[in-house]
Amino acid sequence: MALPVLLLLLALPSRSVQDEELKLNECVCEGMSCGNGDRCQGQQCFASLSINDGAKVYQKGCFQVYEQGKMTCKTPPSPDQAVECCQGYLCNMNITAKLPSSKGQTLQGEAAGYSMETLIIVILAPVVVLVIFSVVAVLIIRRIQKNHMERLNSRDAEYGTIEGLIASNVGDSTLADLLDHSCTSGSGSGLPFLVQRTVARQITLVECVGKGRYGEVWRGQWQGENVAVKIFSSRDEKSWFRETELYNTVLLRHENILGFIASDMTSRNSSTQLWLITHYHEMGSLYDYLQLTTLDTVSCLRIVLSIASGLAHLHIEIFGTQGKPAISHRDLKSKNILVKKNGQCCIADLGLAVMHSQSTNQLDVGNNPRVGTKRYMAPEVLDETIQADCFDSYKRVDIWAFGLVLWEVARRMVSNGIVEDYKPPFYDLVPNDPSFEDMRKVVCVDQQRPNIPNRWFSDPTLTSLAKLMKECWYQNPSARLTALRIKKTLTKIDNSLDKLKADC
């Protein structure tokens, strides 16, 4: 009984599949085998694509025999023939056979052709854009420069026509006349701005007399007179601005401070230059002078006393309408001191100067990223313990540096026929261009000071100078002498020398 039932159950699905296979479907018929009709009936519908003599042939129709259709439909597509099959009413209407291999080749060919065009465009487009951009940039730059020069020329023309300005008769004046006028009619800090610009435009650069990391110094001529023109590099613009600001707002006319004439931002050789025009001193810097010249007692004292006088004038605050705030130099060294024809010196380069006024109790440090010269830095600067909000701290830094300059000068003073070669401070302890760490170790950690030669102690003047410089080098900043005290001490030494000569 169980066996017939089992056979019956196994036979049922077979008949169901057979019924499905025998079911006829109406299909879309397209192609040569369809005759005049566009429909056909079969057990399976198909859509085919074949390549005949290089041409694509599309056909749609039906398989009358299920097994034939089954075999054909399960055959994977070849490069030149493909068939898609389906079952259902007009199911092949919206299907299309595909030739993966043939299509891939066609697409690759198309892609190859397209890639070449794209490659040409990709190469040429940036070049064309770059050329256009460069041309436009050059035109814009030239236009800007032209407009800038036109503005400068128009301003000069305006300045020349304004009545009552000194600029209108500058050509008949000497620098001494102009500076004397500025001292009696204004702040005494320099020429009026319009005169400064006029003077600057009439200067001819003659020769370069010095170069440094922050710019160049030229000897120039104005109305037949020599002037010094310091041309600042673009990275030291803040120093130019600081010196210009300081000279134009503060009474700094002193025989031991470099005389300021004018400051201007001018255009030369299609570039903007920052000029600071001062008195010209043909003897050059104290650094250069000491390398070539030995000193007697009188010339040595004249140099150090004049430097001390200039520093004291900077440090002191003067009250009144012709007053000035207290100023700290912050970069005092032999290269920033110039030698005058009369044997005295004047202090130059105020690009790092700090100002302080007791009336307002304001400390004006400026906005200059430049730092002082590492070789001349005081211990508190090297170990970063300086009280940056206290003006006296900056003055004490100047005193440390003055002591080092005093040592440089004293080495070149002849006594008993003996003199040392010129050397910079700490020449025997640090390299030519010492690092911050080199100086910190020598000055702060080891607490070393420049060597005092034994022969100094056989000369009363050098003995006094050695004592004085040691009092400038105290590790404790507050223990150092003031600039005024140094000036008075040097004056006393100078007077005692004069008295000794008179007695002789």
Swiss-Prot record:
EC numbers for this chain: 2.7.11.30
What is the predominant subcellular site recorded for this chain?
A: membrane
In its UniProt entry, what is this protein called?
Answer: Activin receptor type-1
Q: Which residues bind ATP?
A: V209, G210, K211, G212, R213, Y214, G215, E216, V217, K230
> What is its biological role?
On ligand binding, forms a receptor complex consisting of two type II and two type I transmembrane serine/threonine kinases. Type II receptors phosphorylate and activate type I receptors which autophosphorylate, then bind and activate SMAD transcriptional regulators. Receptor for activin.
Say which species the protein is native to: Gallus gallus (Chicken)
InterPro entries the record matches? Activin_recp, GS_dom, Kinase-like_dom_sf, Prot_kinase_dom, Protein_kinase_ATP_BS, Ser-Thr/Tyr_kinase_cat_dom, Ser/Thr_kinase_AS, Snake_toxin-like_sf
Topological domains on the Cytoplasmic side lie at 141-504
Q: What class of enzyme is it?
A: transferase
Q: Which Pfam families match?
A: Activin_recp, PK_Tyr_Ser-Thr, TGF_beta_GS
Q: Where is the GS domain?
A: 173-202
Q: Which PROSITE patterns match?
A: GS, PROTEIN_KINASE_ATP, PROTEIN_KINASE_DOM, PROTEIN_KINASE_ST
GO biological process terms held by the UniProt record: activin receptor signaling pathway; acute inflammatory response; atrial septum primum morphogenesis; atrioventricular valve morphogenesis; BMP signaling pathway; branching involved in blood vessel morphogenesis; cardiac epithelial to mesenchymal transition; cardiac muscle cell fate commitment
Q: Which gene encodes it?
A: ACVR1
